[in-house]
Amino acid sequence: MSRPNWFIALPLPSQADWHQASRSAPPALRRFHPADLNLTVAFLGPCGAARAEAAWLALAPYASAAPSVSAGSWRALGPAQQPSAYGLLLDQGRVELERLLAHWGAVALEAAGCAASRRPPLPHVTLLRPKRRESAPWMQPMQAWMATAPLPSQSLRLEHLALYTWSRDRSERLFRIVH
């Protein structure tokens, strides 16, 4: 197995039902486990545990400052020709989160000794990914599905930051929370 990636994120509360919105998506896509749903603050990559811990500690003072959020629309993420993920963009809380993510992300990346992000923050929650090494027969059905797909009606309070890495058994859950 390659070196695990690390990231800091705002986990969706355990009572959130946002994963239900992806149930009717084309079956060729892999659905995230409800406990894996999060809003990424800083992707640290394979930086190692010590550097990830430094990033986590740098963000500790901000741990409870996130706003309430609501889903706004579905979006394909990654390259337009072959998206790498599908998720929900945020409506309520989006502007405040863009500001917070820009600041928090910069603090975390610097503390971990990682390069600064070149992309502006895009507050979203990823729910679906294509299965690896597949051609894209699901792209057109997915575009049609997103045009009419349900949105979660429940607003959520993102209550705390968490440090994530890969799950030890990725067959069920992709990630595990370290802190």
Model-flagged regions — what are they?
Residues 1-179:
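Histidine-dependent nucleotide/RNA phosphoesterase domain, centered on the 2H-phosphoesterase fold
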